[in-house]
């Protein structure tokens, strides 16, 4: 992966805030080819502890709406404030399977990193999200997976503990 921003980030902070795969690294790779400009409004849907939101706000100077069902807005607000991101990242509690509380044509980009598989594994979620995008906006999703098929007897050593 080509992730120089993540590679130079505070490793202890990343390890303390990861809830699975390194969401900052995945986000950096995911959005590298997208036309992100300063001031864009981005919905980070299923942001967890917000490291994907932090990358989007710091690296791209975007305004990020960090939406998660399980991590409280207060917890994320404290984390964002510690990094000087008050006014750049707005933490919210959102259940994506219910009403999404935003205006239509509001976001330039909607991202979901290591979360979409929990709420979007159906035929309606993408259609539900589209009205919230501005014309020409993008939806970018990263979900965990393997590059190839593995039989149970031939799993890579790094995966066996899981």
Positions of PLM-derived features:
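N-terminal, positively charged/glycine-rich alpha-helical extensions of SAM-dependent methyltransferases
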Residues: 1-11
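Class I SAM-dependent methyltransferase Rossmann-like catalytic core
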Residues: 9-22
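Conserved alpha-helix/loop element of class I SAM-dependent methyltransferases that forms part
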Residues: 20-38
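Class I SAM-dependent methyltransferase SAM/SAH-binding core
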Residues: 43, 49-98
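A short acidic, Gly/Pro-enriched loop at the edge of an enzyme's catalytic core
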Residues: 100-110
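A short SAM/SAH-binding and catalytic strip from SAM-dependent methyltransferases
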Residues: 109-121
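A short glycine-rich, Lys/Arg-flanked "PGG" loop and its adjoining helix->strand segment in the class I
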Residues: 123-138
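Short, glycine-/aromatic-enriched active-site segment of Class I SAM-dependent methyltransferases
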Residues: 144-162
């Amino acid at each position: 992966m080509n992730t120089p921003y993540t590679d130079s980030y505070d490793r202890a902070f990343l390890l303390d805030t990861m809830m699975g795969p390194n969401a900052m690294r995945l986000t950096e790779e995911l959005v590298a080819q997208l036309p992100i400009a300063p001031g864009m409004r981005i919905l980070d849907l299923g942001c967890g502890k917000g490291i994907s939101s932090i990358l989007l706000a710091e690296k791209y100077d975007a305004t990020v709406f960090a939406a998660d069902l399980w991590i409280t807005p207060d917890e994320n607000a404290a984390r964002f404030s510690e990094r000087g991101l008050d006014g750049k990242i707005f933490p919210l509690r959102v259940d994506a399977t219910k009403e999404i509380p935003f205006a239509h044509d509001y976001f330039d980009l909607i991202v979901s990193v290591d979360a979409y598989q929990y709420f979007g594994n159906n035929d309606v979620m993408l259609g539900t999200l589209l009205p919230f995008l501005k014309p020409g906006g993008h939806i970018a999703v990263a979900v965990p997976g393997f590059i190839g098929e593995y039989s149970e007897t031939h799993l890579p050593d790094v995966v066996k503990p899981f």
